[in-house]
């Protein structure tokens, strides 16, 4: 992944939150992200597809669910930026984390 593409991907509020939530939680399914971000499934999927295209995420199908996590092959400096931002942005993510920690009614 190129540096410019990385920062462009992070420039969108939804994609930034997805990356930060995955950094904090390890892996999440689409319904978890839909619940946390309060956006429709097609919008979540569109943002996830963009992040996959930029090689920031990998996915794994388990039964009927697809789980997403940060790409372990991502350069260390990129992972460090996402991780540091996540750990220092609890106010930015507070509502998302609160909804994520409640039961996911969409699953």
Regions found by a protein language model. Name each.
Residues 53-62, 69:
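Beta-hairpin "wing" of winged helix-turn-helix
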Residues 16-20:
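Pre-recognition alpha-helix immediately N-terminal to the DNA-recognition helix
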Residues 8-14, 72-73:
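Short helix-coil-helix linker/hinge
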Residues 40-43:
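Helix-turn-helix DNA-binding motif, specifically the short coil turn and the N-cap/start of the second
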Residues 2, 24, 76-107:
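Amphipathic alpha-helical dimerization/coiled-coil segments
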Residues 33-34:
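A short acidic, leucine-rich amphipathic alpha-helix
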Residues 13, 25-29:
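Short capping segments at the starts of secondary-structure elements
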């Amino acid at each position: 992944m190129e540096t410019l593409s990385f920062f462009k991907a992070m420039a969108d509020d939804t994609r930034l939150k997805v990356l930060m939530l995955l950094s904090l939680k390890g892996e999440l399914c689409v319904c978890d992200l839909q619940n946390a971000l309060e956006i429709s499934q097609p919008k979540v999927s569109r943002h996830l597809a963009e992040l996959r295209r930029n090689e920031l995420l990998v996915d794994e199908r388990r039964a009927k669910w697809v789980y997403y996590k940060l790409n372990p092959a991502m350069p260390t400096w990129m992972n460090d930026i996402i991780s540091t931002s996540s750990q220092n942005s609890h106010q930015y993510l507070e509502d998302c984390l609160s909804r994520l920690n409640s039961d996911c009614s969409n699953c």
